[in-house]
Amino acid sequence: MISRILPKIVSAGLLLAASVLMYAFAPSATAQTSSSPDAKAPQLDYEFFKARVEPIFLKRRSADHARCYVCHQMAHHGGGPLSLEMLSPGATFWTEEQSRSNFKTVSKLVVPGDPDSSLLLRMPLAPEAGGLADTHQGGRQFASEDDPDWKNIKAWVMGQKAAASPAH
């Protein structure tokens, strides 16, 4: 019995360690986009993030999927790669300061201009749609790249600006 369980525990531990290392050594979006004046990577737009991406973390996707925020809040996830600010009691959205902190945290999980290398897009995407296999403990939030919320996150990763964002 133990011989069957031990490999699973070791495998889960290695996966967790790899995720932490990827996060720890991932350059921030600012570092990636400002390291050279002629960098081709787009800047991540805070206003687009706040208006179109951040609400996705609070959105209930379906009866069998919890909101991202349920697991990815600082009190629950405590320092993991996607640790969102705690909402104030009774609040339905983050304050400006909290949103800016979330932007900084979430930006570390994307490679501006490269959705295929952005963990924020690949981890919650179903493996058959191009997501990473067995990496997101909370289930697959996106069945395909055609999901409107997935497309909003991709647009942000690609440098979409709030002023140019299409209407819902």
Describe the residue ranges of each PLM region:
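N-terminal secretory signal peptides that target proteins for export/translocation
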Residues: M1-P7
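Bacterial N-terminal signal peptides
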Residues: S11-A24
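Aromatic- and Gly/Pro-enriched helix-to-coil junctions and flexible linker segments
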Residues: F25-H168
